[in-house]
Amino acid sequence: MPTTVWLVSHAANAALRAGTFPRAPVAGDDADEALDARSIEALAAWRERWSARLLRGERDGEAPRALTSPAAIARASAHATGFAAAASCNALADTVFGAWQGKRLADLAREAPEALEAWTRDPSFRPPGGGESFDDVRARVGAWLDAMPEAGPDLIAFTHSSVMRAAILHALGAPSASFRAIEIAPLRVAALRRAQHGWVWLAARD
């Protein structure tokens, strides 16, 4: 059977709800990416709705292989939904935000409004300080997808909205500027299936 990849956006937490860019990982300090009561409740509801199906898989009961972004919030989301053995995968990592890491959107809107506007509209824009553009993310995600065999085990991948946008646009062969037209909320699922000509975006059944 063709490979199917189930992409899951990680849970929201206090930092995400406050509109704060993720900080650079610091050994032993994942406070900004910790789950809170609201995210734990949302994850429990997601697990009730989705995990039995995904743990069972769609190949006569064969469970998919689980992967996760290296980010603590993605790993915690995988663990809380029954995929504790998910392996870390760098291709699923969040966008690198450079000097914007740890900053609030509201503060950037005051301090650097033109740069923030460019980031929301231009897929080639890189945040200062070594940040990644959407085009950069799309290139790494597209390379990861295209390296997969046409037939292989299904995958479930806990990742970030930017990675999911990149994967969907890669599957569709759509221009990167279309990233503005895709909204992905926390704990949403997108499915991609391998095909002879590339990838097909499947409507995930909730």
Functional labels for PLM-detected ranges:
Residues M1-V5, W46, G57, S88, ...:
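Acidic, low-complexity terminal tails and accessory targeting/binding regions
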Residues P2-F83:
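Active-site-proximal alpha-helix that buttresses catalytic centers in soluble enzyme cores
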Residues T4-V5, P64, A151-S162:
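Generic beta-sheet signal
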Residues S39, L43, R47, A112, ...:
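Short amphipathic alpha-helical/adjacent loop interface patches that line ligand
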Residues L54-A91, E117-A118, H170, R193-D206:
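Conserved histidine-centered catalytic loops in small-molecule metabolism enzymes
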Residues T81-R140:
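Phosphate-handling substructures
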Residues R126, S133-F134, G152, L187, ...:
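A structural signal for the main folded, soluble domain(s) of proteins
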Residues R140-P149:
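A short, acidic, amphipathic alpha-helical segment used as a generic capping/interface helix at domain edges
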